[in-house]
């Protein structure tokens, strides 16, 4: 017996299988099974971790959709077609032309500025002539016409050239007419007019005609500038188009009626009295004293 114990102490790995308890063997088997499962399923753990990370961050995929929906949803309020702003009490929206939809509304001030800059009195889309009340400002309150530097330079050069050209034409005509008159007097004395007289007469006629054409073209440009200046310094009040105003008045009561029909009346119970209503024709209750 003592020899067997000494052998076990010297070499414990050579213990027979019969001496081991079933509990220890079962624990070892469970540990081996768990280790093999962990080794065989690394992909499952990775997929589970990825699914958990996706579930923990749900806003990453839905945030752009909500933003796109907000940007796509149209506004139901009426806006100005020039500045794309809503109307208020100080600057209400008007319907000056026959355009429909979102293009029919415009601010009075925006339309006034557009008419002043474009110098037109009709809508550029439906070609409807605006119903306007115009009034010029006093000369003291007139403002300068808004022009670029190139336009101002062109106007200054054209005016200077026009003045010089008119002076030259007038002077040349005066000299030619004076010389022609002297030659006519000499021809009357001699009785014969020489060919230089007819040449000067043709030159005078051509110069006079060219001067008239040049003055007509330049005066036309000046008239256009004058009209622009007058249009810029006038007060304009545009009225609503009667056709669109009547349509809006017809649609307004229809909308009100539909809103009234859609409304639901909810009865509110009376909480002040806890007594129940008595039946009609029932005798009054007699309370004994």
From Swiss-Prot:
Segments of skewed composition (Polar residues): 59-69
E.C. number(s) listed in UniProt: 2.3.2.27
Post-translational modification: Has a short half-life. Instability/short half-life permits rapid changes that allow efficient induction of antigen presentation once antigen presenting cells, APCs, receive maturation signals. Small changes in protein levels significantly alter the cell surface display of MHC class II proteins. Ubiquitinated via ubiquitin-conjugating enzyme E2 D1/UBE2D1 independently of lysines, leading to proteolytic degradation.
TM region positions: 155-175, 197-217
Zinc finger feature spans (RING-CH-type): 72-133
Ranges where the record places region Disordered: 13-69
Name the UniProt record assigns to this protein: E3 ubiquitin-protein ligase MARCHF1
Annotated region (Responsible for down-regulation of CD86 and MHC class II cell surface expression), positions in chain: 222-279
Keywords attached to this entry: Cytoplasmic vesicle, Endosome, Golgi apparatus, Immunity, Lysosome, Membrane, Metal-binding, Transferase, Transmembrane, Transmembrane helix, Ubl conjugation, Ubl conjugation pathway, Zinc, Zinc-finger
Protein location: Cytoplasmic vesicle membrane; Late endosome membrane; Early endosome membrane; Golgi apparatus, trans-Golgi network membrane
BP term (GO), one: antigen processing and presentation of peptide antigen via MHC class II
Effect ascribed to mutating residue 232 to F: Almost complete loss of down-regulation of CD86 cell surface expression
Pathway(s): Protein modification; protein ubiquitination
Signal sequence extent: none
Function: E3 ubiquitin-protein ligase that mediates ubiquitination of TFRC, CD86, FAS and MHC class II proteins, such as HLA-DR alpha and beta, and promotes their subsequent endocytosis and sorting to lysosomes via multivesicular bodies. By constitutively ubiquitinating MHC class II proteins in immature dendritic cells, down-regulates their cell surface localization thus sequestering them in the intracellular endosomal system. Also regulates insulin sensitivity by controlling surface expression of the insulin receptor subunit beta/INSR by direct ubiquitination and degradation.
Written domain comment of the UniProt record: The RING-CH-type zinc finger domain is required for E3 ligase activity.
GO CC list: early endosome membrane; endoplasmic reticulum membrane; late endosome membrane; lysosomal membrane; plasma membrane; trans-Golgi network membrane
Chain residue ranges for the region called Responsible for low stability: 1-66
Highest taxon, organism lineage: Eukaryota
Annotated knockout phenotype: Shows increase in the cell surface expression or half-life of MHC class II. Null cells have accumulated MHC class II and CD86 at the cell surface and a low antigen-presenting ability for exogenous antigens, in conventional dendritic cells. Null cells have high antigen-presenting ability for exogenous antigens in B-cells. In addition, mice are insulin sensitive on both chow and high-fat diet.
């Amino acid at each position: 017996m003592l020899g067997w114990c000494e052998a076990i102490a010297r070499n414990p790995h050579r213990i027979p299988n019969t001496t081991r308890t079933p509990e220890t063997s079962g624990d070892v088997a469970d540990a081996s099974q768990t280790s093999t499962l962990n080794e065989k399923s690394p992909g499952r753990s990775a997929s589970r971790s990825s699914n958990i990370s996706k579930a923990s961050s749900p806003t990453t995929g839905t945030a752009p959709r909500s933003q796109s929906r907000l940007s796509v949803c149209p506004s139901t309020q009426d806006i100005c077609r020039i500045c794309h702003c809503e109307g208020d009490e100080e600057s209400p929206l008007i319907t000056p032309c026959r355009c429909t939809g979102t293009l029919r509304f415009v601010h009075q001030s925006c339309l006034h500025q557009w008419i002043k800059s474009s110098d037109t009195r009709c809508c550029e889309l439906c070609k409807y002539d605006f119903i306007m009340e115009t009034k010029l400002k006093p000369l003291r309150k007139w403002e300068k016409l808004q022009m670029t530097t190139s336009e101002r330079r062109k106007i200054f050069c054209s005016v200077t050239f026009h003045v010089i050209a008119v002076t030259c034409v007038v002077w040349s005509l005066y000299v030619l007419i004076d010389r022609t008159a002297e030659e006519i007097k000499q021809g009357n004395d001699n009785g014969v007019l020489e060919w230089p007289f007819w040449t000067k007469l043709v030159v005078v006629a051509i110069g006079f005609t060219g001067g008239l054409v040049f003055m007509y073209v330049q005066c036309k440009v000046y008239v256009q500038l004058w009209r622009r200046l007058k249009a810029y310094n006038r007060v304009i009040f545009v009225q609503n188009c009667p056709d669109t105003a009547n349509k809006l008045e017809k649609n307004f009561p229809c909308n009100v009626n539909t809103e009234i029909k859609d409304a639901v009346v909810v009865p509110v119970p009376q909480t002040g009295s806890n007594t129940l209503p008595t039946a009609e024709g029932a005798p009054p209750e007699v309370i004994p004293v």
